[in-house]
UniProtKB/Swiss-Prot annotation:
Component of the translation initiation factor 2B (eIF2B) complex which is a heterodecamer of two sets of five different subunits: alpha, beta, gamma, delta and epsilon. Subunits alpha, beta and delta comprise a regulatory subcomplex and subunits epsilon and gamma comprise a catalytic subcomplex. Within the complex, the hexameric regulatory complex resides at the center, with the two heterodimeric catalytic subcomplexes bound on opposite sides. Its main location: cytoplasm. Acts as a component of the translation initiation factor 2B (eIF2B) complex, which catalyzes the exchange of GDP for GTP on the eukaryotic initiation factor 2 (eIF2) complex gamma subunit. Its guanine nucleotide exchange factor activity is repressed when bound to eIF2 complex phosphorylated on the alpha subunit, thereby limiting the amount of methionyl-initiator methionine tRNA available to the ribosome and consequently global translation is repressed. This is Translation initiation factor eIF2B subunit gamma. GO terms for molecular function: guanyl-nucleotide exchange factor activity; translation initiation factor activity. The gene is EIF2B3. It holds the Pfam family LbH_EIF2B. Belongs to the eIF-2B gamma/epsilon subunits family. Keywords: Acetylation, Cytoplasm, Disease variant, Initiation factor, Leukodystrophy, Phosphoprotein, Protein biosynthesis. InterPro entries: eIF2B_gamma (IPR051960), NTP_transferase_dom (IPR005835), Nucleotide-diphossugar_trans (IPR029044). It is found in: Cytoplasm, Cytosol. The modification Phosphoserine is found at S260. The modification N-acetylmethionine is found at M1. Activated by the chemical integrated stress response (ISR) inhibitor ISRIB which stimulates guanine nucleotide exchange factor activity for both phosphorylated and unphosphorylated eIF2.
Length: 452
């Protein structure tokens, strides 16, 4: 077994809490499948037979009851009161990890050819290989935003070599001063660096086993994304000998601590005697200067996905966008599953668009139009209803003559007769009164708050 696959399904979805307060984030419906189905399906498609899923007890119960895959999941539940980052989660399952690791987030939806990331990891004997995509701005409004401009998220500054594969620099603009400082040791080996500010981390990582060993002994690192990876990128161009020389100048106790926590001591234990493959050294000849990979002990690489679907469902806007895009993806992944479930009852079938999905046991009345929308299971949509560019979860009732556009309607909500709803988020169990007009509103329970 070359890799052990690990799916992280612990995060509570802090940026979409009005959705996740009643449904755990890994179980949020996307295209009428739980969100966690997508990374699990990706692994199964490329031949993984086992996967470790780190999650909560609520998600474990649902997976055990509904898991319909050939792949065998080893579900590990974190303590209910634990506040664990992704690095903490790897430490928690450390006794199970015997080989190099492939880590995925439960909110990743992608049709990437996974072998492109894995082949990069193999060819260059990398410490880390990760997946990134070019950022894509959705032109669709986000429900409940009330006309405000979308908050500008801080960018990552990503530096790569002339091949676009070697990851040379990585920092968030929040961590940078007014000037961008590049170490001389990097420029010596790579005088030409190409910087990107529009790339998004997909949270898919191949990691050497010694990286996990290092994490086990360094409890101060809690996050793979924000702490471990920037550390590894920086460590590529500092030698073990210079690190040791620096440590010798410190006090004895501090020197001993640094030595035990530094990545190079773990590389020595793992594979100091194993030089990088000849092919890797040869491949590194491309560009301005030849680099002897056998001397560069920490090596970080990135596969930048330029085409296809690659999205992380981390906000309401991205959740809506994922539901718009997955019908096309599912037609390729699950061609045996029709977009309209066989148990659904639809009076005016010609008014249901081919770009929509209809779940089991749903009833749609006469002259009701469904366009570019995902409708969950056991919904009741009565006569003369118009639903456009929406997501309706399970057991939603929409009464006669209602019009819903660009909205998310959560489980068990009721939209009464003649209501007009546009760009809204209606929480679980909420009721919208007859003939109401709602625009750009978030209507949820008092215990549900969200950052949009």
């Amino acid at each position: 077994m070359e890799f052990q696959a690990v799916v992280m399904a612990v995060g509570g979805g802090s940026r979409m809490t009005d959705l996740t307060s009643s449904i755990p984030k890994p179980l949020l419906p996307v295209g009428n499948k739980p969100l966690i189905w997508y990374p699990l399906n990706l692994l199964e498609r490329v031949g993984f037979e086992e996967v470790i899923v780190v999650t909560t007890r609520d998600v474990q119960k649902a997976l055990c009851a509904e898991f319909k895959m050939k792949m065998k999941p080893d579900i590990v539940c974190i303590p209910d009161d634990a506040d664990m980052g992704t690095a903490d989660s790897l430490r928690y399952i450390y006794p199970k990890l015997k080989t190099d690791v492939l880590v995925l987030s439960c909110d990743l939806i992608t049709d990437v050819a996974l072998h492109e990331v894995v082949d990069l990891f193999r060819a260059y004997d990398a410490s880390l290989a990760m997946l990134m995509r070019k950022g894509q701005d959705s032109i669709e409004p986000v429900p409940g935003q009330k006309g405000k401009k979308k908050a500008v998220e801080q960018r990552d500054f990503i530096g790569v070599d002339s091949t676009g594969k070697r990851l040379l620099f990585m920092a968030n603009e929040a961590d940078l001063d007014e000037e961008l400082v590049i170490k001389g040791s990097i420029l010596q080996k790579h005088p030409r660096i190409r910087f990107h500010t529009g790339l998004v981390d997909a949270h898919l990582y191949c990691l050497k086993k010694y990286i996990v060993d290092f994490l086990m002994e360094n409890g101060s690192i809690t996050s793979i994304r924000s702490e471990l990876i920037p550390y590894l990128v920086r460590k590529q161009f500092s030698s073990a000998s210079s690190q040791q020389g620096q440590e010798e100048k410190e006090e004895d106790l501090k020197k001993k601590e640094l030595k035990s926590l530094d990545i190079y001591s773990f590389i020595k234990e793992a594979n100091t005697l194993n030089l990088a493959p000849y092919d890797a050294c040869w491949n590194a000849c491309r560009g301005d200067r030849w680099e002897d990979l056998s001397r560069s002990q920490v090596r970080c690489y990135v596969h930048i996905m330029k085409e296809g679907l690659c999205s992380r469902v981390s906000t309401l806007g991205l959740y809506m966008e994922a539901n718009r895009q997955v019908p096309k993806l599912l037609s390729a992944l699950c061609p045996e599953e029709p977009p309209v479930h066989s148990s659904a009852q639809i009076v005016s079938k010609h008014l249901v668009g081919v770009d929509s999905l209809i779940g089991p046991e749903t009833q749609i009345g006469e002259k009701s139009s469904i366009k570019r929308s995902v409708i969950g299971s056991s919904c009741l949509i009565k006569d003369r209803v118009t639903i456009t560019n929406c997501l309706l979860m399970n057991s939603v009732t929409v009464e006669e003559g209602s019009n819903i556009q660009g909205s998310v309607i959560c489980n068990n909500a009721v939209i009464e007769k003649g209501a007009d709803i546009k760009d809204c988020l209606i929480g679980s169990g909420q009721r919208i009164e007859a003939k109401a007009k709602r625009v750009n509103e978030v209507i949820v329970g008092n215990d549900q708050l969200m950052e949009i």
